[in-house]
Amino acid sequence: MDQSVPSENQPETGEGRTIIDIAGIMKMIPHRYPFLLVDRVIDIVRGERGIGIKNVTASESHFAGHFPNHPVMPGVLIIESMAQTAAVLVVDALGTDAEGRVVYFMSIEGAKFRRPVVPGDQLRIECERLQHRGNVWKFRGTARVDGQIVAEASFAAMILRPSPAQQAEA
């Protein structure tokens, strides 16, 4: 049963359609170029799971050194794209309760990388909530290219208000 509920960041619902575009994502998480690693979210079942999309392009700065003449997306950035997709899911689930708070990455377990991700690939990032207790959320993430798993991991995140010093810098 689809439990997606449209919000101001979700003009449409249903797999394959953009339900949170890049502008909506930028309202939900603090990441910006060159470290914003999810382009849109195409499906959400509120508080349970979602699917993000990351278009991998040759113009991304990490490809200059990883590796020259043989660009490969660093695995840690694939994991970060999972974490950012999960952060969008947390903010979406909490709604107005998430205002003024930031989702921080806490831990990772069982990360596996199956094949290289290169410019021109489109990552399909599937995140499923495993547990939610208080401010801590645990997820299982899988990244696919053309239907094949390229990376997977379990990870945890915590949503908190930034410290006064961090807020002053913003």
From Swiss-Prot:
Identify the catalytic residues. Answer: H66
Give one Pfam family. Answer: FabA
Output the CDD domains linked to this UniProt entry.
FabZ
**UniProt-listed InterPro entries:** FabA_FabZ, FabZ, HotDog_dom_sf
Entries under Gene3D superfamilies matching the protein: Hotdog Thioesterase
Is Lipid biosynthesis found in the keyword set? Answer: yes
Catalytic activity of the protein: a (3R)-hydroxyacyl-[ACP] = a (2E)-enoyl-[ACP] + H2O
Where is the protein localized?
A: Cytoplasm
Alphabetically sorted, this entry's keywords are: Cytoplasm, Lipid A biosynthesis, Lipid biosynthesis, Lipid metabolism, Lyase
- SUPFAM superfamilies per UniProt: Thioesterase/thiol ester dehydrase-isomerase
Kindly list the GO molecular function terms attached to this UniProt entry: (3R)-hydroxyacyl-[acyl-carrier-protein] dehydratase activity
* Example of a GO cellular component annotation carried by this entry: cytoplasm
Gene Ontology biological process terms, A to Z: fatty acid biosynthetic process; lipid A biosynthetic process
At the top of the EC hierarchy, this enzyme's class is: lyase
Q: State which Enzyme Commission number(s) the record gives.
A: 4.2.1.59
Q: Which family does it belong to?
A: Belongs to the thioester dehydratase family. FabZ subfamily.
Question: Which NCBIfam families does this chain map to?
Answer: fabZ (TIGR01750), PRK00006.1 (NF000582)
- State the function annotated in the UniProt record: Involved in unsaturated fatty acids biosynthesis. Catalyzes the dehydration of short chain beta-hydroxyacyl-ACPs and long chain saturated and unsaturated beta-hydroxyacyl-ACPs.
This chain belongs to the protein called 3-hydroxyacyl-[acyl-carrier-protein] dehydratase FabZ
Naturally occurring in which organism (per UniProt) = Granulibacter bethesdensis (strain ATCC BAA-1260 / CGDNIH1)
